[in-house]
Amino acid sequence: VLLSGCGTGVISTVGEMRDTGDPKYVALTFDDGPSPRCTPRLLDGLRELGAKATFFVVGCQVVKDPDIVQRIAAEGHQVGNHSYDHADLHSLTSAQALADLEKNDALLRELLGDGDYWVRPPYGLMTEAEAAALSVPLVNWSVDTEDWRTKDSGKILDVIYRCTGDGDIVLLHDRYQNTVDAVLMAIEHLQQQGYVFVTVAELLEIKGIAPQAGETYRRA
């Protein structure tokens, strides 16, 4: 089921986000890129703030701007597979859905080298049988900013501040300038409250979770 809003994980209020002295780890994830307008600016901001993120890229965008994806990986962020064509995998046969993911995986391997490119299916939807056929983990989210819908920095910030807590995986899209504005403001603010921004793989490792192929992770 596609999650929305604060998701089904533990919801943190603004009051609960006060610094307790212990680091709080969050994974910001960005779908549907790369975008030549937005992704480089986002990467500049992440570098300045010392924050890491995970980018679930779409193959049909990767072929247009491969240098941006190479930069994402070179700067220590995690690159994931968001399919090649961003089709609703439920509208495809299982063979077609898996072939679309495999096409993007092959592209990423050619561009970045061999590695485990974790999967986020478009719209977060995939059958159990399709997931079980994968050799990598799947990643969904516990906080949905709905940035693609609102395109409003204030509303995006509100969701992040109300809903994000230790161990959350936040869904965003690096195709909107308002998202970049909101994210960089949020990172700077939350870092002052003890938040550390890491990749999904790092988040699971920090929380002592060993990722398994075919399993879906929404938070840590």
Spans of features found by a protein language model:
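C-terminal motif of bacterial Sec signal peptides marking the signal peptidase cleavage site
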Residues: L3-G5
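Active-site beta->alpha N-cap acidic-glycine motif
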Residues: G7-E110, D114-D116, H189, V196, ...
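Catalytic domains of cell-wall/extracellular-matrix polysaccharide-remodeling enzymes
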Residues: R41, V63, A87-E215
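Short, solvent-exposed mixed-charge patches
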Residues: R219-A220
